[in-house]
Structure formats: structure tokens, C-alpha cells
Amino acid sequence: MKTSGYPESLQESLAKVESSRAKRVELAKKQKYFHKLSPNEYEEILKKYHPDYKPEGRKRLKVGPNKGEKLQTELIEILQGQPWVDPIDFKKRLKSPDFSTDVLIIGGGGAGSTAALMASENDCQVILATKLRHGDANTIMAEGGIQAADLPYDSPYYHFLDTIGGGHFTNDKRLVRTLVLDAPIVIKWLEDLGVMFDKEPDGTMKELKGGGLCRRRMHSSKDMTGLEIMRVLRDEVRNRADRIEILEFCPAVELLLDETGAIGGAILYNLETEEFLVVKAKAVILATGGYGRLHLYGFATTNHYGATGDGLVLGYRLGIPLRNLKYAQFHPTGAAFPEQCIGMLITEKVRTLGAEPINCDGERFCHPLEPRDVESALIIRECVERNKGVITPTGRVGVWLDSPMIDMIWGEGTVEKALASKYLQFKRYGIDIAKEPMLVFPTLHYQNGGLAINE
């Protein structure tokens, strides 16, 4: 008798998904997917169903350089919150600080660790201060892959166009240009450091096509890409202890200005000893990550517990303007069951390998690889307006992501090998994702925008 990790209340819907699977797999093998939407349809769907396009859940900023701008309520609350300490009380301690260094890096994820390595290679003494442990960051939770246009039939030009299109032509084109030109160099640098990307039998990179892309350019390490990258970066940073000092459990609570008005360091708070520390630095780099744990609009999130928008607050209190924070990125497939995993990322790689979003009646309702904002809006529409979602025992709603299609398309064992992390995570709850689909709903994923920079 077949066992299932899903409760009895979901079995009828599961049976409908199973009964329609063979036909859907045949269509997928012939590349016959649910039709893709046009750009005009994108805008219509987003305006109706995407959380960022709804007027509720926003307030106007009352202070600072962005005064009058409407932003998410949760973000407004931390930007306008009362400071924990008065920096003026600590300014004199810059003359006799607890620590002094060339470069202070606030944040210990992938960006902070990379900045520390680059600074140390340029003869700088570095202090890396992190809120939790070194490596406790969103980087370590990234799964599906990292993009770079490095195949013969691809180019940074196409990567640029895909990125601009995915951003609905509102991107900062200079930053996008930097991203797409640097990406192949960064992939090579990571590989040289020791990151083990998935490879083809001939030794070339195994690259997949993600949502909104016209070419295959997603480099992965099974479905644990961020974990693999962070493993190598963390190891490399810790092997340079002569130049990089790590202060764990020491979040920054304020930045400090020196007598010239330039940033001269920061106030840290040691969570273990409950004391404030002053770090004097010739340069300060903010690498604090996003704001997912603010749970904008009440959504679950893929983000780690330290992702509370600290860098935005630190910079805004010094008068640095905010840019492009109007929209957040929601990942279309966050776990909606079991309850212990709510919001957990279900990597895009699942859909890249062939799994399709399916409603409660076992029907396709959208192309599996639309841009993330569009895919999220389509899933919300299916659940909220069309009432075609699956209701969990706790009252949550979601759609099926039919992962068993992957083994039927690519051969038995593909799910367990290519999605090793997800396979084990769901196995703990009695769900074999090679045989049963996952229940998903959009989850807060990336912070778009941030503090304004000079270039």
C-alpha cells in the first residue's frame, strides 16, 4: 500500500494530479507548455495580483532624504524607529577605540566574505563583523544556481537584455552592465577557489535555463549552490587570520562619523557579553543583506533570521538616500506544507528540470518559467480569485509543484541526485518528492534596491 506524507484532506487533490501527470509529461517532452504571457499581459497580471502593486500595506516616510515616499509599512517602521544609542555619546571613543583597522566589513555572508578577501589581497587589515555566526546569511540558503553568460552561444548582451526585461526596464543600467560583464569572471574565480559546480561528462559547466532567460546560464551545485559557495568563501576567509579578524555575534547598531564628517567606524553590540564596542576604520563596507525577516505584507520568507534590513537603517540615519525599494522580489515557490517549512525556498531548478505548477484539480494554469514576479502573481490569482488552490489543515493555501514529472522526463533517480537537499528535507516529513508533488505558494525572497551609491 502506498504511503503518503500528506493528510487525508489533501488526498483527493493529489489523486487528480497523479491522474493527469502522464499526459502532462508527454506534452513537456514535446516542449508543449502552457502558453507564455505577452508583455502587456504581464503588466495586467502584476497590477491585479502582485502584492507590490496593491495600495494597502504602505505608508509615507516622515523623515530623511526620502521624506514623502511611500514604502512598505514594515520598512517604514524600522527606518523611523528610535535609535538604540546616541552616536554622539560614542564619537569621542574613536580616539581610543576597542578595535582599529583599515577596512570594517559589516556582514558575514557571501558579499561580506568576498569583500574581506578582496581587501586582504590589497594589503588591508580587515575586521569582519557579523550579527550571527560567520556564514549565517542568505547566501548559504541559495539553492538553484548563479548566473553568468559564459557559453559559446550566450553573451553578456543577452544576459543584459534578460535582466532589463525582467526588471520591466526600471533597472539601473550601469549596475546591470557591471553585473553581466563581471559574472563570468566571478564564476571562474569561485571555481578556482574550490567551488564544485555541476559539470557535464566532458568537464564543461552544466548550465540550466531559469525563468525569464533566453539562454542556459544557471550554474549550480545540485540544489545547494549557496551552501557550496559559502563553504569555500568561509574557509578562505578563515585561512587568512593574519589579515582578517572575525567578530561574531556583533551586529552594528550605528555608524560613526569622524571630525571631517566622513564615516570613521561603527558601534557594534556584542550579543554574548552585552557590551558596546567601537571600531575605528579607514573604510566601512555595508554587506548586511536584505530585509526578508520583516515579512512584508505578512508573507513568509526564504530569508535567514538576521535579514532585517539593518544596512538600510544604518545608512539612512546618516542621510544616505534610498533607491528602488518600491518593489520586493517574491519567489513563486515557497513551501506551503508541512507547517515547519513554511516559506522555505523551493528552488527554481525544480521547474527548470520540468516540474509544473498544478492547481487543486490537477490542471496546468501557467507556464512554469515565467519571470518570478509574473509566476508569483499567477499562483496568487489561481489560489485567491479562481479558488483553485489547495487548502492545508492549518488554513494555508498553495498549488502543487509536480516534482515527480522530473524522473519521468529525465529518468529515475534524477530528483534524488539533482535536488538532493530538497529530497532529504521533505523525506523527514514522510514526503518523497520523487513520487509526490510539493505544495507551494509565493514567498518573500530578495530585497530590490537599497542605499544610493556614487556609481
Give the location of each predicted region.
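Glycine-rich active-site loop/strand segments that organize a redox cofactor
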Residues: 148-179
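N-terminal Rossmann-like FAD-binding beta1-loop-alpha1 element of flavoenzymes
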Residues: 101-128
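An anion/pyrophosphate-binding glycine-rich loop and adjacent beta-alpha core
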Residues: 2-19, 320-444
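Residue-level detector of alpha-helix initiation sites
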Residues: 109-111, 133, 224, 291, ...
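Glycine-rich loop(s) and the adjacent beta-strand/alpha-helix scaffold that form part
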Residues: 283-340, 344
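Glycine-rich FAD pyrophosphate-binding loop
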Residues: 120-146, 152
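Extreme N-terminal leader/targeting segments of oxidoreductases
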Residues: 1-103
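Conserved redox-cofactor binding core of oxidoreductases
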Residues: 53-74, 78-79, 191-275, 280, ...
